[in-house]
Amino acid sequence: THPSVLPFIKQLIGTMDSVRGLPR
């Protein structure tokens, strides 16, 4: 696992959580 992958996944999870927070 490359060190650059960790921030990427963390950002991805943050994006998913942000999308979940959006009203639909």
UniProtKB/Swiss-Prot annotation:
This is Unknown protein 3.
